[in-house]
Amino acid sequence: MKKKILASLLLSTVMVSQVAVLTTAHAETTDDKIAAQDNKISNLTAQQQEAQKQVDQIQEQVSAIQAEQSNLQAENDRLQAESKKLEGEITELSKNIVSRNQSLEKQARSAQTNGAVTSYINTIVNSKSITEAISRVAAMSEIVSANNKMLEQQKADKKAISEKQVANNDAINTVIANQQKLADDAQALTTKQAELKAAELSLAAEKATAEGEKASLLEQKAAAEAEARAAAVAEAAYKEKRASQQQSVLASANTNLTAQVQAVSESAAAPVRAKVRPTYSTNASSYPIGECTWGVKTLAPWAGDYWGNGAQWATSAAAAGFRTGSTPQVGAIACWNDGGYGHVAVVTAVESTTRIQVSESNYAGNRTIGNHRGWFNPTTTSEGFVTYIYAD
């Protein structure tokens, strides 16, 4: 009996000991899993924080580009309004200058014909009395004074139109530079937005707990990264194309009016002499490279340095003393005014007033200098009313 009791006690002790060992082992395994999970969560949190920093940095870059685009657009709106105002002021000053020139030329011809000194003496000699002589002399003095005031006003207006033309040209150049910067920023923005999307999807993939959702997000991330790479390739191609176009435009400037005229003639044409204007430079850099004004300045160096947009050239040329008209001539500058920026070109061949050829740049998007349209009617183009500026 004692042996059975002892055996039972020993069996119970062994069973309790085994249960205790199993319970302890199970507790240690669960703790290890919890610790491992905690470590995994901790690592994932750190990775998420790093990914969030990347997203924030790219978002700042995107916001900066968008802010710059907004500022550039606002500046362009302001400069275009300023250019429009200056255009009106230049036109008005040009009219005044041309009108005064006509008056001064008439007075000069009259003085040469009648003789100012002889007329002055005759006025005194033919007076019936000293009082009448004094009155006549006073009247002639007033006329001379008025002429002097007219000359001073003419000088002031010419100075004002020169300053406004420079300011207008600066505004136009800035607008064109801003437009190019906006185009560059648009390409950069596309790349940054694609990178942002990839970073956001990367963050979402790291936060995902379900394997199916994570796999889907990883596929989207790979697609977004491929899109970002494609955008970067497109941006590089855009820059390369732009550089190539710029080289073509600059290379097209290695020409002159004689070469352009000969290109459309069956036999070599006689050289066309440009009017020498010492006050103007032969450098076309005062106009944006590739614009129609730059092309004309390259072919016709006698043109002014700060004549504004193509639509403004006729009034600017008239104010500078150049002759303008409606009859095309080889070597003349054709100036179209469509109510906007307008267009200019150099005439290289003439059959009639409705059939000419020209050399130009920035026609139909082609920014190189050349004959881009052959024979055409200059009076029926979409570019507006045509006026010709003559070198002499």
UniProtKB/Swiss-Prot annotation:
InterPro entries: CHAP_dom, Papain-like_cys_pep_sf, PcsB-like. Residues 1-27 form the signal peptide. SUPFAM superfamilies: Cysteine proteinases (SSF54001). One of its GO terms (cellular component) is cell septum. Lacks peptidoglycan-hydrolase activity in vitro, probably due to auto-inhibition by the CC domain. In the homodimer, interaction between the CC domain in one monomer and the hydrolase active site in the peptidase C51/CHAP domain in the other monomer probably mediates auto-inhibition of the hydrolase activity. Residues 267-390 form the Peptidase C51 domain. Its EC number is 3.2.1.-. Keywords: Cell membrane, Coiled coil, Hydrolase, Membrane, Secreted, Signal. Residues 47-267 are annotated as: Interacts with large extracellular loop of FtsX. Putative leucine-zipper in coiled-coil (CC) domain essential for function. CC domain probably acts to inhibit peptidoglycan-hydrolase activity of the peptidase C51/CHAP domain. Homodimer. Interacts (via N-terminal coiled coil domain) with FtsX (via large extracellular loop). This interaction directs PcsB to equatorial and septal sites of dividing cells. Interacts with FtsE. Peptidoglycan-hydrolase activity. Required in maintaining normal growth and cellular morphology. Involved in splitting of the septum during cell division. This is Peptidoglycan hydrolase PcsB. It comes from Streptococcus pneumoniae serotype 2 (strain D39 / NCTC 7466). The gene is pcsB.
